[in-house]
Structures are given as structure tokens and as C-alpha cells.
UniProtKB/Swiss-Prot annotation:
Places the protein is found: Host cytoplasm; Host nucleus
Residue ranges with Polar residues bias: 207-217
Gene, per the UniProt record: PA
SS bond list: none
Name of protein: Protein PA-X
Residues flagged as site, Important for efficient shutoff activity and nuclear localization: R195, K198, R199
Organism: Influenza A virus (strain A/Hickox/1940 H1N1)
InterPro entries referenced in this protein's UniProt entry, alphabetically: PA/PA-X, PA/PA-X_sf
Region (Disordered) location: 203-222
GO molecular function, one term: RNA binding
Function: Plays a major role in the shutoff of the host protein expression by cleaving mRNAs probably via an endonuclease activity. This host shutoff allows the virus to escape from the host antiviral response. Hijacks host RNA splicing machinery to selectively target host RNAs containing introns for destruction. This may explain the preferential degradation of RNAs that have undergone co- or post-transcriptional processing.
Pfam family, one: Flu_PA
Family of the protein in this entry: Belongs to the influenza viruses PA-X family.
UniProt record, GO biological process: viral RNA genome replication; viral translational frameshifting
Length: 252
């Protein structure tokens, strides 16, 4: 699974996912299914915000790469992928600026057009079940919930899907591609089944124990991709270039 993740996702996404796991004391080299799930969720959050801007009239518009209107305001503020301290700083800033109610849990995005926080979900199960779990956890009507599945289904608060159909179709197509690529490598069953995932986790732990006594050279260098992209990622005036730079799974 780890090889698949590194082949299928942009290096920046993988590094952000690894940082998030380590922040919670989890090992991305062992819990590879969780790493894949976090990478998928991150990419969906980025794709959700791709190309969406707000013009001077306050209208939501879609601007493709290469368009001269690069100074337009991004419609969505991405919160997911930041470390917790920075994420809460962004949330507090948004609340102070817009008057939005501060959420109890960190959301994934903020929609400047609809003036609401958004919680994005990507599930391997039934969308309505995952939606109810999210709603029960958040317990706030102020946070909008939007759930996607790997089968092309989706569910959103009050059936308000926020994005246009084409933008949502891009996300669904990407999720379906990830599923197909996992299946072709024999990874999908363990990604979906808790029992199979537990078996794979034990296998990973055993493999790591065997390698523990072997001398390992650890690189301390920051990857070129992250070194270039991270300043843009942290910049509130980031362009759509970062948002659209994600790699597709290579053909076998």
C-alpha cells in the first residue's frame, strides 16, 4: 500500500498526511491503510476548492489555469492539512473576520460565498451511515457536511451540494480511479475490510521488527516538491497552481 500511495498521490500530499499521522503518534509506514485514507481525503479537499473564486460582485466563478484573473479571491479556505495550531489560528481568524460561529471540531474548509465551514467525508461504506456519524459527532447545524464515496454516491446537508455538477464529477472520477487502481494491485479488500486491514497491520509490524536490527540511513532532506510548494501552501494568496498540481496514478 505504501508504494501505491507514493505512486498515486502528489509528494506534498503524502508528506502532509505523514505529518498529520505523526502528530497523533501514528506510524505511516505501519498504518498504511490510514495513510492512503488521509491522502485521499486531502486530495478531495484540494479538488473541492480547485478553480473556484469569488469575483468583485461576490459571485462564485470557475477560473481554469492560465486565466489572467489570478488575483481573484479564492472561494474556499483550506484548513485540512495544516498542523493543529495553525489550523485553529486560521479558524479563529475566519470567525473574527466573518462573524461565523466557532466550530467545536476542526473543519476541512471554509466557504466564503456561503459563509460556512465545511466538513468533507470520504467513505468506503454507505454514504448515509457515514453522514449520520459525522452529523452526530459535530452536532452543529452551522457546519455543512458533504460526503463522497468510492462508488460515486454523495450526500450533503439539506441536499445542498455546494459545487457545480462538473466539479463534483471530477472528484467522483478521481475516487473511482483510486478504487480501480487499488483493486488492480490487490489492495482494495484490505482497504475496505477491517479484518483484512488488521491482518495487514500485523504483517507490517512483523516486517518492521525484522528490519529494526538492520542499519538504515535516514534522509533529513526536505523533498524538492515540498520545499517549493510549502510556502505557497501557507500563503493566503496561493494560486490555483498548487491546488491543481496533483498527480494521477501512473498507468501500469
Amino acid at each position: 500500500m505504501e508504494d501505491f500511495v507514493r505512486q498515486c498521490f502528489n509528494p506534498m500530499i503524502v508528506e502532509l498526511a505523514e505529518k498529520a499521522m505523526k502528530e497523533y503518534g501514528e506510524d505511516p509506514k505501519i498504518e498504511t491503510n490510514k495513510l492512503a485514507a488521509i491522502c485521499t481525503h486531502l486530495e478531495v479537499c484540494f479538488m473541492y476548492s480547485d478553480f473556484h473564486f469569488i469575483n468583485e460582485q461576490g459571485e462564485s466563478i470557475i477560473v481554469e489555469l492560465g486565466d489572467p484573473n489570478a488575483l481573484l479571491k479564492h472561494r474556499f479556505e483550506i484548513i485540512e492539512g495544516r498542523d493543529r495550531t495553525m489550523a485553529w489560528t486560521v479558524v479563529n481568524s475566519i470567525c473574527n473576520t466573518t462573524g461565523a460561529e466557532k466550530p467545536k471540531f476542526l473543519p476541512d474548509l471554509y466557504d466564503y460565498k456561503e459563509n460556512r465551514f465545511i466538513e468533507i467525508g470520504v467513505t468506503r461504506r454507505e454514504v448515509h451511515i457515514y453522514y449520520l456519524e459525522k452529523a452526530n459527532k459535530i452536532k452543529s447545524e452551522k457546519t455543512h457536511i458533504h460526503i463522497f464515496s468510492f462508488t460515486g454516491e454523495e450526500m450533503a446537508t439539506k441536499a445542498d451540494y455546494t459545487l457545480d455538477e462538473e466539479s463534483r464529477a471530477r472528484i467522483k472520477t478521481r475516487l473511482f480511479t483510486i478504487r480501480q487502481e487499488m483493486a488492480s494491485r490487490g489492495l482494495w479488500d484490505s482497504f475496505v475490510s477491517p479484518r483484512e486491514a488488521k491482518r495487514q497491520l500485523k504483517k507490517n509490524l512483523k516486517s518492521q521488527e525484522q528490519c529494526a536490527s538492520s542499519p538504515t540511513k535516514v534522509s533529513r532532506r526536505t523533498s524538492p516538491a515540498l520545499r517549493i510548494l510549502e510556502p505557497m501552501w501557507m500563503d493566503s494568496n496561493r494560486t490555483a497552481t498548487l491546488r491543481a498540481s496533483f498527480l494521477k496514478c501512473p498507468k501500469k
